[in-house]
């Protein structure tokens, strides 16, 4: 079984350098173009199922990239929950909240603001990944989600301890994982090709 994981296109929060978290922020015009471009990149692949984060930016990405597929949503592959920081500019949070905020942000621990931490997010993403292992061995599945969720998928596949894995995913990049004989394999990480608009 193979999954193709697509990070959403550039969102308004990405553009503004704001905490998106679980906010329903849309894609920018650039993000919409990125989503259409990654659809061209994936055109030759047949998917048996498409699973999408229920947040708007991921849904918009899936609808543009894979318009001929119906999809199901799953909240477990949302971005990390940032609580009361949702929608706020990183610069404003830094100026108003100071060192404690910078420490929490570096640790990806937003529990002080009513959000979640890495361990809580890892549990829900790992549950999602474990559920995927029940799919048919020859299934090909597209997943549209967020950089944070992709990071936790990678941690699950690599069986590494949090937070010791440093990995980043560009907007509308594609990462590929295969599950075979009881084991996950990383095939590709953060592939963008030449189709993703940079400006």
Locate predicted features.
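Generic beta-sheet signal
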Residues: 3, 139-147
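Loop-to-helix element that buttresses phosphate recognition and phosphoryl-transfer chemistry
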Residues: 3, 7-61, 113-126
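General small-molecule cofactor/ligand-binding pocket signal
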Residues: 4, 72-74, 187
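Phosphate-coordination/substrate-recognition cap region in phosphate-metabolizing enzymes
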Residues: 37-101
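Glycine-rich phosphate-binding loop signature in dinucleotide/nucleotide-binding domains
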Residues: 43-46, 132-139
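Short glycine/proline- and acidic residue-enriched helix-loop micro-motifs
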Residues: 99-120
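Domain-level recognition of soluble alpha/beta enzyme cores
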Residues: 161-185
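Acidic, His/Gly-rich catalytic cores of divalent-metal-dependent hydrolytic chemistry
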Residues: 187-199
